[in-house]
């Protein structure tokens, strides 16, 4: 099943309940002057919230929820604007304040708008509780180091652009990421500083010479003086709005939708199972629509496959929104990725990408596959044609794994045996899967190695000049494709060849692959800059 764009959380800032304002208008961007705000929340509340004792707004916006009703005076602030898409949803603008009425749903909270008095559901990852670090414009949540660097290096941002993120290696620590130069031609440089906790959660420090009761206090201080950092903090790095959790609150559970709500506007491509279209839901929301050829599978099997996709929620997996199964052809409705398949992108607009962008995309794909690996889901058709490309952040495209409608939940033996007569994309399929039909997470790792070959060659067909039967025979005899031109030797030796190990259990995990690529350029430089004396 083909699909076409995590929930990255973006902090937006607010004028509601702000007790201190830091003016950085002297660092004017070409577009506009910007003022960012620092909430001056109490120390005790901030620390207990960071310990996870509050209602869980950390990370990707999930968790918490508890028993339903909430104190009406608990106030939320909107991080982004949101337009209502259906009855029961509530529209709002960035900075609007709302009272939290019910938080029992992990993706949609029921609120009352402070100004209008209207009630309705809002996507949880579009709001934050006031006077917590999640409501701060500079807080990025749990994002990879390389993503943080791309955010502060976005075009037209000044020296001192910064964010604070939760460290992946130690969730009790934070990291301060700062743009050290504003050289637009050379892209600027970035410094990272560890923010550590004091004993007994009494505060935070970068250097023991100066401690702070809260992260807000730390930001205020270093916005006035660098005091050992590379420069003053000047401007919170802007971040992309997160992916909507669903088309609307109603479609979260009722994801069988009437097909007359869909308008198919432009055909994007054909596949073995049907066509892919660009369209709109209710004339508002851009979506991708996969139409299944009649007779491809039963409604029961179709819904079983779609249920797997519906439950998957990761920034590097395409989000499934809804289905239409009341009549044929069946539809799958997913988020729309503006730049299409990675294969076509590599052959066209992406043909000029440098090694840093290619490595970053490899890390994103491995991150999405790591999510499937953790849930014992096998993709079975991982290839550049089944990875989709969205917008760029600092020159690096956002990529997401798609077409995992073929995915199967592995049983205890960790093997899925394909039915007799099933067809496989031979050049991407591991030997044990091609010859015996045995698919595992490790056969996906083999396919990932072939996908890397596609990335490094900018979309060349694997095993050039060889037909399928020859590929099967030669691979069985030990043949492996040579190192592509321009591919770093370390990537070929430590990743591609290991992904193509004849013994499945000796192939790396996607967790290993993700961290290899995520840390690829970090290994040549100090991980964190020490503050100067």
Curated annotation (Swiss-Prot):
Membrane topology: Lipid-anchor
GO cellular component, one term: plasma membrane
Domain SH3: 71-132
Domain named SH2: residues: 138-237
Primary enzyme class: transferase
Gene3D superfamilies in alphabetical order: Phosphorylase Kinase, domain 1, SH2 domain, SH3 Domains, Transferase(Phosphotransferase) domain 1
Swiss-Prot/TrEMBL keywords: ATP-binding, Cell membrane, Cell projection, Kinase, Lipoprotein, Magnesium, Manganese, Membrane, Metal-binding, Myristate, Nucleotide-binding, Phosphoprotein, SH2 domain, SH3 domain, Transferase, Tyrosine-protein kinase
GO molecular function: ATP binding; metal ion binding; netrin receptor binding; non-membrane spanning protein tyrosine kinase activity; protein tyrosine kinase activity; signaling receptor binding
Record SUPFAM superfamilies: Protein kinase-like (PK-like), SH2 domain, SH3-domain
Tissue spec: Expressed in some neurons (ASE, ADF, AVA, AUA, RMDV and BAG) in the head region, anchor cell, vulva, cells around anus, body wall muscle, pharyngeal muscles in procorpus and metacorpus. Expressed in gonadal distal tip cells.
GO biological process: anterior/posterior axis specification, embryo; cell differentiation; cell surface receptor protein tyrosine kinase signaling pathway; commissural neuron axon guidance; embryo development ending in birth or egg hatching; embryonic digestive tract morphogenesis; endodermal cell fate specification; establishment of mitotic spindle orientation
Catalysed reaction equations from the record: L-tyrosyl-[protein] + ATP = O-phospho-L-tyrosyl-[protein] + ADP + H(+)
PROSITE patterns: PROTEIN_KINASE_ATP (PS00107), PROTEIN_KINASE_DOM (PS50011), PROTEIN_KINASE_TYR (PS00109), SH2 (PS50001), SH3 (PS50002)
Mod. after translation: May be phosphorylated on Tyr-528 by csk-1.
Transmembrane segments: none
Catalytic residue positions: 381 (proton acceptor)
UniProt EC number: 2.7.10.2
CDD domains: PTKc_Src_like, SH2_Src_family, SH3_Src_like
Cofactor(s) it depends on: Mg(2+); Mn(2+)
Start and end residues of each Protein kinase domain: 262-521
Modified residues (Phosphotyrosine): 416, 528
Result after altering residue 165 to A: Loss of interaction with unc-5
Subunit structure: Interacts (via SH2 domain and SH3 domain) with unc-5 (via cytoplasmic domain); the interaction requires kinase activity. Interacts (when activated and phosphorylated at 'Tyr-416') with ina-1 (via cytoplasmic domain) and with ced-2 (via SH2 domain).
Reported function: Non-receptor tyrosine-protein kinase which plays a role in endoderm development by controlling spindle orientation in EMS blastomere, probably downstream of receptor mes-1. Also involved in embryonic body morphogenesis, especially in the formation of the pharynx and the intestine. May be dispensable for pharyngeal muscle organization in the adult. Probably phosphorylates netrin receptor unc-5, to regulate distal tip cell (DTC) migration during gonad development and in axon repulsion.
Protein name from the UniProt record: Tyrosine protein-kinase src-1
Organism: Caenorhabditis elegans
Gene (name only): src-1
């Amino acid at each position: 099943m083909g699909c076409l764009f995590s929930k990255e959380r973006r902090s937006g800032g607010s004028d509601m309940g702000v007790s201190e304002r830091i003016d950085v208008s002297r660092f004017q961007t070409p577009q506009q002057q910007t003022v960012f705000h620092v909430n001056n929340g109490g120390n005790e509340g901030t620390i207990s919230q960071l310990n996870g004792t509050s209602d869980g707004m950390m990370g990707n916006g999930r968790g918490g929820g508890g028993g339903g009703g909430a104190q009406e005076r608990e106030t939320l602030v909107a991080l982004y604007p949101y337009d209502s898409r259906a009855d029961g949803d509530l529209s709002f603008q960035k900075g609007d304040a709302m009272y939290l009425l019910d938080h029992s749903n992990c993706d949609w909270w029921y609120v009352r708008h402070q100004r209008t008095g209207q009630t309705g559901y809002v996507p949880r990852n579009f709001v934050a509780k006031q006077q917590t670090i999640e409501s701060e414009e500079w807080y990025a949540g749990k994002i990879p180091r390389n993503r943080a660097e791309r955010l502060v290096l976005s075009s037209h941002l000044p020296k001192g652009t910064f964010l604070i993120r939760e460290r992946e290696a130690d969730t009790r620590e934070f990291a301060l990421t700062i743009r050290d130069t504003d050289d637009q031609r050379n892209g600027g440089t970035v410094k990272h500083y560890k923010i550590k906790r004091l004993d007994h959660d009494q505060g935070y420090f970068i250097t023991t010479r100066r401690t702070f009761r809260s992260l807000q206090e730390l930001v205020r201080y270093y916005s006035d003086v660098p005091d050992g950092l590379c420069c003053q903090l000047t401007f919170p790095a802007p971040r992309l709005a997160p992916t909507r959790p669903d088309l609307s609150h109603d479609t979260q559970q009722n994801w069988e939708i009437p097909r007359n709500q869909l308008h198919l506007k432009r055909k994007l491509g054909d596949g073995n199972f049907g066509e892919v279209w660009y369209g709109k839901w209710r004339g508002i929301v851009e979506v991708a629509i996969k139409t299944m050829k009649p007779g491809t599978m039963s409604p029961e099997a179709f819904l079983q496959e779609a249920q797997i996709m519906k439950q998957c929620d990761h920034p590097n997996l395409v989000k499934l929104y809804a289905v239409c199964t009341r009549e044929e052809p069946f539809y799958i409705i997913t988020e729309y990725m503006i730049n299409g398949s990675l294969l076509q992108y590599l052959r066209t607009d992406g043909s000029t990408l440098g090694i840093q962008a290619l490595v970053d995309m490899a890390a994103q794909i491995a991150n999405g596959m790591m999510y499937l690996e953790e849930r014992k889901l096998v993709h079975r058709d991982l290839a550049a044609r089944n990875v989709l490309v969205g917008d760029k952040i600092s020159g690096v495209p956002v990529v997401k794994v798609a077409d995992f409608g073929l995915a199967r939940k592995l049983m205890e033996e960790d093997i899925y045996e394909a039915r007799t007569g099933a067809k496989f994309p031979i050049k991407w399929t591991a030997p044990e899967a091609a010859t015996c039909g045995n698919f595992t997470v490790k056969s996906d790792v083999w396919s990932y190695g072939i996908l890397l070959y596609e990335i490094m060659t900018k979309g060349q067909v694997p095993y050039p000049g060889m037909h399928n039967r020859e590929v099967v025979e030669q691979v069985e005899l030990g043949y492996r494709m040579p190192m592509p031109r321009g591919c770093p030797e370390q990537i070929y030796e430590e990743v591609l060849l290991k992904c193509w190990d004849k013994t499945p259990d000796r192939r790396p995990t996607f967790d290993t692959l993700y961290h290899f690529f995520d840390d690829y350029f970090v290994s040549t430089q100090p991980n964190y800059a020490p503050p100067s004396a």
